[in-house]
Amino acid sequence: MSGHSKWHNIQGRKNAQDAKRGKIFQKISREIYMVAKSGGPDPDGNPQLRLIMDKARAANMPKDNIKRAIDKATGTGGADYEEITYEGYGPAGVAILVHALTDNRNRTASAVRADFNRNGGNLGETGSVSFMFDRKGYIAIAREDLEVDEDQMFEDVIEAGGEDLQTSDEVFEIYTDPKAFADVRDELQKKYDLATAELTMVPQNTVPVPADKVEQLQRLIDRLEDEDDVSEVYTSADFPED
């Protein structure tokens, strides 16, 4: 683990994501639809659906939206989506992974390539940067009003099955094996309010972003996240603190 705080980058994107909440709901609905269609509509028998429903609730997505996406998946017909990952580099040599759900791979590839080209990036071949990331479970617990020291939190994390704990003045950040994520989350949830809990891609090393590249890189990330077919964007960027 690189030791870099993922929380810092999450908070840096929060306001922009709040402004795009409708589009976020649309993307999560597509994820729910695809997973429910392939693995069944019952979250008890479909762990992947359960995780995405948790993601929907964390985004404050209305229950009716979740139900509509599941109901749509149980009907006949409907679009067939496939998962595709695009890999490339952004300004300052930052590695970027783009996960997409699409029913038209040519449309999506063209849009993603254009975003890279127009914003100082370069779309690479499959495998060009994915080896720089590890799949992990990620849990954040805000420290505000929390009367727990690092030693106690470390003990609780290890007991729950977590792999790593990183601490700052603002937050405890826990990383898990992806297969153990749900169990660790459920165990920690018994004692703490979780600010964030998700499966993610964690860079093995981060790239400090120079001040003169911040705006261009952020614009590239924003453009990619704005694409209807793009579900997640992961980077190795270490943005400077404001």
From Swiss-Prot:
Q: Which SUPFAM superfamilies match?
A: YebC-like (SSF75625)
Top-level taxon: Bacteria
GO cellular component terms attached to this protein's record: cytosol
Asked if Transcription regulation is a keyword of the record, the answer is yes
Q: Does the keyword Zinc apply?
A: no
Q: Where in the cell is it found?
A: Cytoplasm
Q: Name one GO biological process term.
A: regulation of DNA-templated transcription
Q: Which UniProt keywords apply?
A: Cytoplasm, DNA-binding, Transcription, Transcription regulation
Q: Principal localization?
A: cytoplasm
Q: Mind telling me which Pfam families this protein's record contains?
A: TACO1_YebC_N (PF20772), Transcrip_reg (PF01709)
**Could you cite one Gene Ontology molecular function of this protein?**
DNA binding
Which residue stretches belong to region Disordered? 1-21
Family listed = Belongs to the TACO1 family.
What protein name applies here? Probable transcriptional regulatory protein LSL_0422
